[in-house]
Amino acid sequence: MLRSLVQNPRVRARVLERVDEFRLNNLSNEEVWFRELTLCLLTANSSFISAYQALNCLGDKIYYANEEVIRSILKSCKYRFYNLKAKYIIMAREKVYGKLKEEITPLADSDQQLAREKLLNIKGIGMKEASHFLRNVGYFDLAIIDRHLIDFMRRIGAIGETNVKHLSKSRYISLESVLKSIALNLNISVGILDLFIWYKETNTIVK
């Protein structure tokens, strides 16, 4: 089932095009990296579409606007968690903007799990968000475990009932190892497998 999707020329071409975009992000500047981090902050507990729309509403204000302005923009865009996420964006900017790429690149180049651990120090970034960020800046060895991947693994019998909203770190790593085994069997990276599963579950490649 999944193997045929991975081997489908049309779907594979679309997925690999997205992968190339992530690889280009890896070569991009600090502004691009912080924008991707902001997207991941906004995606937590929200849909990707809602987060992406909110990010576009914010534009370059993520780099300089104060918390009140960011909160107001998020609210006007009908983004649900405008108070909390405005606070997180400001905290992240004060903590890592200007040195994000410099600090994460050497870590991720040598050990992506260590890079993920470093990102967990940013308020609002959990295992999924850190993995999502690293994938979006060109690192593909970590799984982005959301409800779509949980549903998929449950349907194929790889896991039992799992509450995606209350994943402990150890449970996340356990589920990630299941996905890595599936990816290894298909001869692709787990971060790329995610895109195929996302396509199968949503018929889109926007993640």
From Swiss-Prot:
Top-level lineage group: Archaea
Catalytic residues as annotated in Swiss-Prot or TrEMBL: K128, D146
Family the entry assigns: Belongs to the type-2 OGG1 family.
Natural source organism: Saccharolobus islandicus (strain L.S.2.15 / Lassen #1)
EC numbers, comma separated: 3.2.2.-, 4.2.99.18
Site (Important for guanine/8-oxoguanine distinction): residue numbering on this chain: K207
InterPro entries from the UniProt entry: DNA_glyclase/AP_lyase_Ogg (IPR012092), DNA_glycosylase (IPR011257), HhH-GPD_domain (IPR003265), HhH_base_excis_C (IPR023170)
GO MF terms held by the record: class I DNA-(apurinic or apyrimidinic site) endonuclease activity; hydrolase activity, hydrolyzing N-glycosyl compounds
GO biological process per UniProt: base-excision repair
Catalytically driven reaction(s): 2'-deoxyribonucleotide-(2'-deoxyribose 5'-phosphate)-2'-deoxyribonucleotide-DNA = a 3'-end 2'-deoxyribonucleotide-(2,3-dehydro-2,3-deoxyribose 5'-phosphate)-DNA + a 5'-end 5'-phospho-2'-deoxyribonucleoside-DNA + H(+)
Protein name per its UniProtKB record: 8-oxoguanine DNA glycosylase/AP lyase
Disulfide pattern: none
Record bears the keyword Ion transport: no
Keywords, alphabetical: DNA damage, DNA repair, Glycosidase, Hydrolase, Lyase, Multifunctional enzyme
Role played: Catalyzes the excision of an oxidatively damaged form of guanine (7,8-dihydro-8-oxoguanine = 8-oxoG) from DNA. Also cleaves the DNA backbone at apurinic/apyrimidinic sites (AP sites).
Gene3D superfamilies associated with the record: Helix-hairpin-Helix base-excision DNA repair enzymes (C-terminal), Hypothetical protein, domain 2
Cited CDD domains: ENDO3c
